[in-house]
Amino acid sequence: MIYGIGTDIVSLKRIIRLNKKFGQAFAGRILTPEELLEFPQAGKPVNYLAKRFAAKEAFAKAVGTGIRGAVSFCNIGIGHDALGKPEFFYGPALSEWLEEQGISRVSLSMADEGDTVLAFAVAEK
């Protein structure tokens, strides 16, 4: 059963501006420790940041909280399965919160075209 749906759209220009203004502190604010390790090797670092920012915002909308409490940028990670499909992974506090809410899965789709990045998340009970 669908619990909630979230989407977010981000301009790469916005992420470029934030990255220039705040540098590594910006990445440190929105990426998990695992993502921070991958970030320097990303072929397109700005796209990497933008996709993760959009995906985490979409996640927060799908679960209905916005970014607050256990639903924080550093508790929401994005990885890929064996076939390359994007998927969320969670910090311990968020895993516990999701279980308390009865949310069993949050699916993710991301896309980018030109200056725009889009993420779509579906939370299920």
Swiss-Prot record:
Protein's name in the database: Holo-[acyl-carrier-protein] synthase
Reactions that this protein is recorded to catalyse: apo-[ACP] + CoA = holo-[ACP] + adenosine 3',5'-bisphosphate + H(+)
Documented EC number(s): 2.7.8.7
Keywords: Cytoplasm, Fatty acid biosynthesis, Fatty acid metabolism, Lipid biosynthesis, Lipid metabolism, Magnesium, Metal-binding, Transferase
Subcellular location: Cytoplasm
Keyword Magnesium found: yes
Function recorded in the entry: Transfers the 4'-phosphopantetheine moiety from coenzyme A to a Ser of acyl-carrier-protein.
GO annotation, cellular component aspect: cytoplasm
GO molecular function, one term: magnesium ion binding
Keyword Transmembrane helix: no
GO BP annotations, alphabetical order: fatty acid biosynthetic process
Protein family per UniProt: Belongs to the P-Pant transferase superfamily. AcpS family.
Swiss-Prot/TrEMBL cofactor(s): Mg(2+)
Pfam families: ACPS
Organism domain of life: Bacteria
Annotated signal sequence range: none
SUPFAM superfamilies named in the record: 4'-phosphopantetheinyl transferase
Positions that bind Mg(2+): 8, 57
